[in-house]
Amino acid sequence: MDKEKTLLTLNSFNKNTLMETLKIEFVDVGVDFVTAKMPVNSAVHQPYGILHGGATAALAETVGSCASALFVDTKTKIIKGIELSVNHLKSKKEGTVFGIAKPIHKGRTTHLWEIKVVDENEQLISICKITNIVLDKK
């Protein structure tokens, strides 16, 4: 896997999407993980001035779905998230959070990923799981 080329490809998918709005950027990829970062500021706050759970969920779904896409032939297959769970463990007011997706199961038709959302000090903010379905392109 060409890491730099893969990161460029992943980041190219963000243009004109929610990921671009949230400033999500893929920053690392390996044989068994994908990492993306998102800034925490007023743009992703909820009314109490902390990171909105929906923004965290968007980061988790983004990194988990894109991780699945790395393991299929995207010329013939598409990935769709069918379940997302997010447990928020700690709040975050400002800085950066990182979504790190690691596989739990990579089957022929379904993938299950664990996504840990941590801050720049490696404090666990949220723990997430996403189930993706692998479908034939029509």
Map each language-model feature to its residues.
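Terminal targeting signals and extreme-terminal segments of soluble enzymes
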Residues: M1-K138
